[in-house]
């Protein structure tokens, strides 16, 4: 006879409602935790890696398509009339830049053999770059050198609101400084050299550059692992032939040899960004000399690129830089030839994630089918590239397909709602 005080053990029957509720709670909790920047920055790239790798298994990456030499006559039938405004080719409007006036007795001032500026304190949690955020993260370090108190997220929410956007351009970074930093000013120039970096450092100003970088993992089969990256330079040492840099991927106080930096820098037309307080502007003008003038600076960069193609005709980056500088001067036919040579020599897979001169040159030389092929490849590798979407849209517009063009322009705005070129494109197409 069972004792009435005996309470037999019974396995609880599974309640699917309870299981479902638990899963929902876990999912919500995971979602909330994912919003914490520290956790987000460490998980997002893994999710992005998994997604990219799987998608590339079914759609393998190809080399950049080589354009045709001749343009079919029918491609030139659909064109913009002379009274219409061509699509814009540059983002934010530059602010007025003081004119450089050379002095009759311009004698170079010797600089010391070593300069080490004191960088801002580096906080791993705050300063290590979030996914695809090296531009804002590096700029945040740069601004804090002058006492700014924000961080990379303050910058990215303005110029890169979508975390999946894999690139921030130098003009977007300077735009942020000019409009949101409070009191600081900013310029960027191209065709830099090691002496220019050293002279700016000797004047008490760090230098930010864009350079080539080898990532530590493959995102797809046969990934060449080449990417673009921003770097803050705060010192140099002639005796060791070495720069001191601060890298939001590798950490503070890194060192790189002069020749290695120049080699990595060439891939980006040796572009450099300068941030400075207004009271240092006259000193900076004297340091840059004729390169303070934007057009003169670009002409000098053009001559450097042309010389480097002659010295090393197999250097794809030299040809690409030549095309980029020719595009600036609207010499589109010659630019197209330079880009075609660069692509034939083989460029890195991610090259068009960061630089878009070929899109512009192809469009203006009526290589519309080639532009469609090029932007298709660019979007396969960088599916959130608003610049590739923009120029793919213009290619469809040139073919008379305004509906598809508008769809691409709107897609570009989904990635970056502040992308004025896409907004202007929509307005243009709807009014013409």
Where in the sequence are the language-model features?
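Terminal, low-structured helical/coil segments at or just beyond the last alpha-helical repeat
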Residues: 404-432
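Structural signature of tandem alpha-helical TPR/SEL1-like repeats
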Residues: 295-303, 330-338, 365-374, 400-408
